[in-house]
């Protein structure tokens, strides 16, 4: 195939497109109604009506706002329903703290990053950068198994004892600051490894960093 797109190619593409009248029908539908509406198949909608024979009680609703904790909200919603049912609690008056889970999520993720740096054999910065070890070191995202691990280790907290605060619903800036701090800590660990610091001292450094992270998160999330 030629390296450059030629006008002959464009003419051939155009002729192929225009030779199929169905393309023009699709084009008109999308340009007039948008892609999403144009893709709707009414027969599928008619065959799949949102009618259910089981209705679950409705609990409190919380605005996720500017954070990426959908995985935490989903996990807590599942647990809250079962807890309210088993303990005979009014679901509309009961909620669990997503902020509590998010606190330990960040602390655990920072620990994992530190441990990865301690375990790494090649301390060359270009290698670390190429392996993307620090690119997304402490993010907001998560999944069910990660949620389960945090709950099994740290338990749960009623929402009223650790509610959402100003920054907990606007976590992008805080996550950025926290990542910067963790990355700086990792550079210190890498430098210490290059100086052949023994494993016990590296672990002490990590514990110091984790204590700082705990204080950081406590001041911001409560």
Task: Provide a role label for each language-model segment.
Residues 1-222:
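Catalytic-core signature of thiol
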